Amino acid sequence: MTDNAPITFDGKRFAAHLSMAPGVYCMYAADDTLLYVGKAGALRKRVASYFNGTPKNTRLTAMLAQVVRMDVTITRNEAEALLLENQLIKSLAPRYNVLLRDDKSYPYVLLTREAWPRIALHRGPQIVPGRYFGPYPGVTAVRDMLNLIHKLFKLRSCEDSVFRNRSRPCLQYQIGRCSAPCVNVVTHDNYTEAVRRVTLFLEGKSDLLAEELIQAMQVASEHLEFEQAARLRDLLTSLRSMQNRQYVDGRAADLDVLACAALSGHACVLLLSFRDGRNLGTRMFFPKTNGEERTAEILSAFVSQYYAEYPPPPEILLDQEIPDHTLLEAAFSRSSAHKISLRWNVRGERAGYVELAVRNAQVALSTELTSQRAQRVRSEAVRQLLGLEEPIKRVECFDISHTMGEATVASCVVFDAVGPVRSQYRRYNITGITPGDDYAAMRQAIERRFRRAVEEDKQGERPDVLFIDGGAGQLAQAKMALNAVGVESVLLVGVSKGEERRAGHETLIMLDGQELHPGAASPALQFIQQVRDEAHRFAITGHRARRQKTRMTSKLEDIPGIGSRRRANLLKHFGGLAGVKAAGQTEIARVEGISTALAAKIYASLHGLSKSDAVNASRVS
């Protein structure tokens, strides 16, 4: 294969081997960037539509030109595919989905955890303390449900800022949709009972709730409380007209489903998880094997190791019997608050879940093997480009990230011939240098990484090639760092984007000053871009986390009288430092543990005022 031969993707051939089952498909670029996530009622038909004929628009043309591989996940039905698609888009932010799709998340019903709980529709991060029911497939169903809950159970929907400042009942009370807990029209015991009934309703325990309502209705009738009995009758009628549950999948409760596929000495363990009846999607694991283990042995080893780290659900379904299952059940049950059951040869719906996991494990393994073959082609192209005699076993790449010298972080990512080795990634918090000095940061990071390897004599952890994100200056600093720790057998290569800073136009810089220009279509450059971009991603996420932590805590920690507990109360109350800074002194003083004098001190410190100026500002406001 020549060095400049691009890796092409035969979409028609890929689609021809897919099933007509519903599912989700993902498209990837050469550097493993996720381009697009979509759902399909019939995977083969939907995927084939992308590659039959001319693309309908320039966006689609541009996207398909970048595709080098695809993954698919089979689901039980299209509704599950819809939810899984949304979860992947929200968590992975594919390049083309972000531009084109509605970025709303699926709605939940939120029941807050307060003395007088509030019920409301909720989207987005689940940061408000309380219980979240869902996700639901559409907002209309949630609004209809909330309308029924307000009408029959009369829970409040107002924000706390409104609730705390009411002096008389609002319009919701007047039209019979709220019991006015804000002004104590309803007793706390009665309101708590209403909350309990709403919880049963949202949990899908309509039968249990109906029995309670029938008994309460009989008691009301016996006591001649006919209006109360009529209200309970209406509530019972409404309950029976509603579905027990409106989750996308509310049948599985809490359980994990595991299946193992093996081929050509490689294995894949697929985990399908359900929590509170919600399909959380799949995760794929590719354990290293010697090629001789049976799938049952691989699965047994996985179960033992995985659930030693993560708490198991009450029920774990397997695609086959595994060795030591009785021992594993006993061990898991002893360390858990509930009994753990490992099951196989199941029937009904659970058999369908196992079959689903088996099919997805087979597809995932096939896709992984194809991806590894492509990665080996790129790795071999790098070897040829750099003139190495032996196949590449390990490469590393360093990058630096900071904001105007603040919170500098260096990253080191590791790749072998078949892809990233994430367990060996490292970050280095850079200290003791002039802020913004990238050269000093690079030198410090490389010295720290290789000094440890030299001290521990870890020859196997030394890379064949060390890529540096930068030009000749950064490359020189890397060489100085290696010399300082006595490492000589590592090939250093700088990766420079040049003046135009366009992807595909990178220049590779060698220590002797030689420059290589592989070209955008080169598999070697595609491999190097993937490594470099991963180093950049890993550095910038570490930098942002460090910067956020510094900004969230240091300004409050510097204020006399603010300890860890008061700082936590402030950040929790206002949702972060930005919220504290935006608040007035009166609002700050309402936080638990914050006096009026301390609130003035906090306000002054965050706004660069003297304490007297802060007091005056408070009087003016």
Swiss-Prot record:
GO terms for biological process: nucleotide-excision repair; SOS response. Keywords: Cytoplasm, DNA damage, DNA excision, DNA repair, Excision nuclease, SOS response. It holds the Pfam family UvrC_RNaseH_dom. It is found in: Cytoplasm. Residues 20-98 form the GIY-YIG domain. The keyword DNA repair applies. The keyword DNA repair applies. Disulfide bonds: none annotated. It comes from the Bacteria. Residues 207-242 form the UVR domain. GO terms for cellular component: cytoplasm; excinuclease repair complex. Interacts with UvrB in an incision complex. The UvrABC repair system catalyzes the recognition and processing of DNA lesions. UvrC both incises the 5' and 3' sides of the lesion. The N-terminal half is responsible for the 3' incision and the C-terminal half is responsible for the 5' incision. PANTHER family: UVRABC SYSTEM PROTEIN C (PTHR30562:SF1), UVRC/OXIDOREDUCTASE (PTHR30562). This is UvrABC system protein C. It comes from Xylella fastidiosa (strain 9a5c). The gene is uvrC.
